């Protein structure tokens, strides 16, 4: 049976179908997926899926803060710190975009409700973390990730053009003639659905759950990366995996 995805007053899927059409399919609902959904045109129908519940995202677990360009005078040092930390293998254009856009992103996060530590004058307070040569890290206590992601999630849930399906797994992406046409998903009730989408975004997190010891949620098993490799999608820097020192141990 084929039918379009029906969006209700509160952004819920109102009919069960075996195939559906949406404008944008976002796999994953961490910071990346949520921020994308909030920045897409409101006339686009968006389907978001997440493998577990929406709050079981590693974005919620991030404790440290996020770096931000305080002023233009800090740009060169910020750029050099980032390149050095990446052994100068970074994509320079991506680093530039990350730095230049950081202030606007922070403004968006604050507008979404995120609260960051302030100094005695009410201005953002900055601290310093690894690889940074100066204080440029904003934070919320020791739960910055939770503070940011929870507010982004709240704002997304308010959008009538977004359907968020929890406990829904992407089984594979759908391709034809080297073009991605959507994905096959399995919903919480076990239904297998072919989702046709004009754009498919894989924002499903990393592979930490595959390791014996990890600070990641166990369900983060690299499904999106595996699907991309299967369909010959170009993968970059997949040899870089951050191992947190607190988990780098064995019984022997």
Say what each PLM segment does.
Residues 1-80, 120, 141-252:
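Residues forming the flavin
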Residues 85-125:
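Rossmann-like flavin
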Residues 88-92, 123-149, 208-212:
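Helix-loop-beta segment of a Rossmann-like dinucleotide-binding subdomain
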Residues 89-90, 102-106, 131-133, 224, ...:
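Short amphipathic alpha-helical patches
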Residues 116, 129-131, 172:
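Catalytic phosphate-handling regions of large nucleic-acid enzymes and associated NTPases
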């Amino acid at each position: 049976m084929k039918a379009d995805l029906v969006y209700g007053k509160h952004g819920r899927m109102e009919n069960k179908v075996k195939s559906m059409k949406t404008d944008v399919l976002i796999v994953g609902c961490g910071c990346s997926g949520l921020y994308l959904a909030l920045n897409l045109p409101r006339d686009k129908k968006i389907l978001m899926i997440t493998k577990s519940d929406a709050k079981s995202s590693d974005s919620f677990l991030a404790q440290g803060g996020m770096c931000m360009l305080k002023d233009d005078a800090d740009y060169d040092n910020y750029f050099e710190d980032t390149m050095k930390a990446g052994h100068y293998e970074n994509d320079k254009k991506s680093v530039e975009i990350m730095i230049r856009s950081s202030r606007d992103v922070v403004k968006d996060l604050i507008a979404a409700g995120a609260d960051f530590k302030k100094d005695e004058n009410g201005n953002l307070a900055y601290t310093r973390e690894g690889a940074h040569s100066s204080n440029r890290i904003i934070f919320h206590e020791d739960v910055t990730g939770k503070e940011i992601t929870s507010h982004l999630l709240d704002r997304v849930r308010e959008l009538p053009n977004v359907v968020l399906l929890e406990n829904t797994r992407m089984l594979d992406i759908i391709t034809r003639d080297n073009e991605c046409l959507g994905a096959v998903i399995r919903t919480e009730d076990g239904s297998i659905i072919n989702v046709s989408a004009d754009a498919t975004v894989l924002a499903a997190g990393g592979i930490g759950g595959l390791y014996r010891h990890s600070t990641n949620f166990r369900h983060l098993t690299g499904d999106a990366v595996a699907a991309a490799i299967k369909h010959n999608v170009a993968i970059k820097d997949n040899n870089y995996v951050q191992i947190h020192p607190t988990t780098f141990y064995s019984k022997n």
